[in-house]
Amino acid sequence: MGKKYTESVKLVDKNTLYTVQEAIELVTKTSKAKFDETVELAVRLGVDPRHADQQVRGAVVLPHGTGKTVRVLVFAKGDKVNEAQEAGADFVGAEELVEKIQKENWFDFDVVVATPDMMGVVGRLGRVLGPKGLMPNPKSGTVTFDVAKAIADIKAGKVEYRVDKTAIIHVPIGKASFGEGKLSDNFHVLMEAVVKAKPAAAKGQYIKSVAISSTMGPGIKINPGKVLE
């Protein structure tokens, strides 16, 4: 891997701010691993995440998905159980799933959806789901009675974005095998969503820096002033 990484690094100039198109072209060239690498976007924002009014979070359906099979766990009861199963949920349940997670440390799922009437039950898992970014949230559309739509969106390639403590958002935008066109489409849809999510309390330059990289490849910096072009 060392040799391949060294070759990849030579293709990228650390001091250059590339256009989106140049960066995406480079990321496909620097993806040299034997597996289909994930391409990740990192955006540093001009917000202070310590303040509640400067949080940036949301969700968006990427036009070409992420290339990843997403396992969905749904907390529901009554007729919502059937609705979730028919919509393609991988796991559906209530109290018994809470116990399974608590007792067996079971996490064979990627996204959790819950109906609002189940949040009292799901709340008991806050300490284990929260740190993993798995807690259902109305802002990201994962606390809803419309479980069929929530599942369909997730399976279609919906990704959540959320600013971390260092004011950076990390989101996958697809696989290296997608090629430049699909990665570019996904990049622009995601960046537009992040720009629209700018909090009113955020002052000064909002998009501070942008970079993309493949799983094993080097970071490629993008000119933050040209991300929507």
Curated annotation (Swiss-Prot):
Keyword tRNA-binding: yes
Pfam families hit by this protein: Ribosomal_L1
Keyword Nucleotidyltransferase: no
CDD domains the UniProt entry points to: Ribosomal_L1
PROSITE patterns: RIBOSOMAL_L1 (PS01199)
Domain of life: Bacteria
Subunit-structure text: Part of the 50S ribosomal subunit.
PANTHER family: 54S RIBOSOMAL PROTEIN L1, MITOCHONDRIAL, LARGE RIBOSOMAL SUBUNIT PROTEIN UL1M
Name of the protein this chain belongs to: Large ribosomal subunit protein uL1
Organism from which the protein derives: Clostridium botulinum (strain 657 / Type Ba4)
